[in-house]
């Protein structure tokens, strides 16, 4: 468990920051650096950093309101559907070309971005032909007990179902497999004798051994099997998604929780694992009680139309997964919304996950779709008093425009006479900084994976003429599967063309680029410097020019040579030399992100596959489900979630500054002022 308190220091007064968050700095209090004037802090005897051992972010002004660094993830809300008469319609499989079917652009957007928002309802009926990628034990005693704990289909007696399966088991062909010549049930037959859901003795709780996730716009629903076997699971579930961006596909991932007692002997696992690295990874996860990823699929959806009526996109459609390990029967309906204004009353408040002088952040559930989000409430009077209206509106603008799977998306924004509200995807895998602190450093493949996803996120911002300016592990979240989610856009600079320069002194001391320290003005290339610093820190545990004394650290950034530990990867070293060039015009990425993409360090990556989240992340955060709040400080989560009443009058001229705040999936809605009611 780690503290998230430091994430909520932004937007607080200077006195609050010093009193409550002095631990965020190195041992002693460090003043924020302004206008290129650095003040020396006291030394700490230890150079090992913790989550409280970090230089503070340098804001453009003392009163900057920077978005709260919250962890969000997707909801897994589903309801039961009993319309399970799955008819056979056309089958979709991995041979379909998504580029042709769904009109995927380089950023994953559909061609028509102007159609209205709405709700997409997915009905999941059943699965078929699922197999496991490995054989299992042939022990009848183990399999009989497992079958007896399984859940039968509706209206069928469990004893008859178990007897039928046990009878089949007695006739199944046992094969001598592997170097150990072990008697095993083949992978093709194994799934027929493992229940998809079990009920432990003395318990009425269902424990699914097979489930899959449906992801749309960083919101995730978890669909768990209710009955049947892994080969033929029954689901009968409904899940509804809010559609605010017309993305061209759904991402489906299938997972299994296989009891380790079903695996072949340790000797067999070791010998076969030496021959097949992927198989060894599967065995390692099962033996560590982790879920294994079986298969995936990207289902094309066409939401680019103008219609006020509900439309069925798929009707009892069979989806064959990419690797052919099974298929799923679904229907999908889309219903355009009426673009009615939202209010806080449209959400159930679940938990407080952060607080500050600006207001609070809560985990909420949208009442109509039952999807879980993070809602950030900001008091208007606070940001007016801090002269931060422009920055806050800019933050909302960036969040509404970004279109990248590795950036936390804005789902909605709305306002009342007293407050502004952000509704964002809820991502709960924790800060990258926490995971880096816990492990010290990452291996090469893990660091490469995170760097590649961040490269896509920064490139997406640059294409929108936005400079991020504050890349660091604290501003990077992991979703429940382990993908990157970039957050905190309070220091972004908008309307920055390729050759434009700005000279605002802001960022985080360890990550400041030389041109920023010299006050020469900087371009988008400043983000590639910070990407290099982050990659170096992930591989070594510390930023390249780190020093306890801030002025000394700045001097190192400007003058000291880049040093690498012994045995450092050659391609990683060459990439870092390019990214950490002190001359921004010679820095890798100065002429565009493709310069970085084409570097040998990423030669084994398919960028198209990466953008579609087609790679299995190297690490999956330890969260029980997509609503898990264990990565948030209990000081917040224990508090009763309420939207506190604010009795603060703001004049009409002040209220007009917040015009255009509302976002429900398009930018056509203006801002209507209705006293005492929710404001659009």
Swiss-Prot record:
It catalyses: L-seryl-[protein] + ATP = O-phospho-L-seryl-[protein] + ADP + H(+); L-threonyl-[protein] + ATP = O-phospho-L-threonyl-[protein] + ADP + H(+). InterPro entries: AGC-kinase_C, Kinase-like_dom_sf, Pkinase_C, Prot_kinase_dom, Protein_kinase_ATP_BS, Ser/Thr_kinase_AS. Keywords: ATP-binding, Cell membrane, Cell wall biogenesis/degradation, Cytoplasm, Endocytosis, Kinase, Lipid metabolism, Membrane, Nucleotide-binding, Phosphoprotein, Serine/threonine-protein kinase, Sphingolipid metabolism, Transferase. Residues 347-602 form the Protein kinase domain. Autophosphorylated. Phytosphingosine level stimulates phosphorylation by PKH1. The N-terminal half is phosphorylated by FPK1. Phosphorylation is inhibited by exogenous addition of phytosphingosine. ATP binds at residues 353-361, 376. Transmembrane segments: none annotated. Residues 1-117 are annotated as: Disordered. GO terms for biological process: cell wall organization; cellular response to acetate; eisosome assembly; endocytosis; glycerophospholipid metabolic process; intracellular signal transduction; negative regulation of phospholipid translocation; negative regulation of sphingolipid biosynthetic process. Residues 1-11 have a biased composition (Basic residues). SMART domains: S_TK_X, S_TKc. Its EC number is 2.7.11.1. Residues 603-673 form the AGC-kinase C-terminal domain. Activated by phytosphingosine (PHS), a sphingoid long chain base. Activated by PKH1 phosphorylation. Changing residue 504 to A/D: No phosphorylation. Changing residue 488 to A: Catalytically inactive. Internalization defects. SUPFAM superfamilies: Protein kinase-like (PK-like) (SSF56112). Changing residue 662 to A/D: No phosphorylation. CDD domains: YPK1_N_like (cd11651). Plays an essential role in the proliferation of yeast cells. Involved in a signaling pathway, required for optimal cell wall integrity, that acts in parallel with the PKC1-SLT2-dependent pathway. Downstream kinase in the sphingolipid-mediated signaling pathway. Phosphorylation is regulated by the intracellular sphingolipid concentration. Disruption or inhibition of sphingolipid synthesis leads to the activation and phosphorylation of YPK1 through the TORC2 and PKH1 pathways, which in turn phosphorylates ORM1 and LAG1 to activate sphingolipid synthesis. Present with 2950 molecules/cell in log phase SD medium. This is Serine/threonine-protein kinase YPK1. It comes from Saccharomyces cerevisiae (strain ATCC 204508 / S288c) (Baker's yeast). The gene is YPK1.
